[in-house]
């Protein structure tokens, strides 16, 4: 009796965004966790210029000594299936005399581990939808809305979820109506956080305490995105909660909440604190919160997940004042492809809840394999 073939999983990582290196680090952890006896794994890196290549040595992408990895352009170029009737990856080019285009075998599901624009924002998801390819995570709309802090806040507020005070503007308005923008920002009250609307990993974010620091902060944000979001600084503990779709189709599952505390060296939980200077950050899983607040955080995380139409997984970030119970919860954002390195908060929260890293990856792939293609 022949054995059932192993599902073939294309793990896609890297990409054109400023979060390229973090995506590579995520991929190193996920590829090490995938069980080769269960899945046939195809690692595909996307270079910083958008070239898709087969990757031969995924271990090279681990974060060591603070050095940030990058997908090399030297691998075999690959492309997605040519139409919806075949699921075969395509090898582009080859040795002299070899066919210019050759099939590399069918893929059952894509695990996209890209962070930021051109990957997490619905663009890659749309490409996979065009080729009728199953993939892990949220679809085009939820991915795009979750990446755009302005759109996300509008959607969440429209569903009655608590969102902190904020404003948004584009670079051209900063150039033509600076006084108007400054007035809107100062109505929030200092300090504020100035952010690129469509970036993650705390890239391009500045904490501003007075008008004098505003121009430099806007310039930093605009260097990453012409759309800028400014948020009032909120009082409360920085709490995160993982959400995972239920394999049996029930209500989304939630992890025990975790807490982020910056204990020195940084004004807030910025890129360096997240990835390069963990000694000044305390990540606590589970967070030390009263039971009723934990329950309220988990309920809120599910509401956010469903309001955004998210699928597969997400991390919901909140500010919590435990003394005020459920009234002390404010939603900061949703991440539809959260940091997924073995030391990232999302897998750590699930480990504290009883789902270890390999099992978490396995569940996500199984969810994608069961999900229909096309409109759903």
From Swiss-Prot:
Grouped into one coarse class, the protein's main location is cytoplasm
* Reactions catalysed according to its record: 2 D-alanine + ATP = D-alanyl-D-alanine + ADP + phosphate + H(+)
Cofactor annotation: Mg(2+); Mn(2+)
> What GO terms fall under cellular component here?
cytosol
GO-annotated biological processes = cell wall organization; peptidoglycan biosynthetic process; regulation of cell shape
Q: How is the cofactor bound?
A: Binds 2 magnesium or manganese ions per subunit.
Q: Output one GO MF annotation.
A: D-alanine-D-alanine ligase activity
Sequence positions that bind Mg(2+) 1: 317, 333
Q: Where is the ATP-grasp domain?
A: 153-366
Q: Which EC numbers characterise this protein's activity in its record?
A: 6.3.2.4
**Which Pfam families does the record associate with it?**
Dala_Dala_lig_C, Dala_Dala_lig_N
Q: Binding of Mg(2+) 2: at which residues?
A: 333, 335
Q: Which domain of life is it from?
A: Bacteria
* Enzyme class of the recorded protein, top EC level: ligase
| Cellular location(s) | Cytoplasm
Keyword entries, A-Z = ATP-binding, Cell shape, Cell wall biogenesis/degradation, Cytoplasm, Ligase, Magnesium, Manganese, Metal-binding, Nucleotide-binding, Peptidoglycan synthesis
HAMAP family referenced in this protein's UniProt entry, alphabetically? Dala_Dala_lig
Protein family per UniProt: Belongs to the D-alanine--D-alanine ligase family.
What protein is this chain from?
A: D-alanine--D-alanine ligase
Could you read off the lineage of the organism from its UniProt record? Bacteria, Bacillati, Actinomycetota, Actinomycetes, Kineosporiales
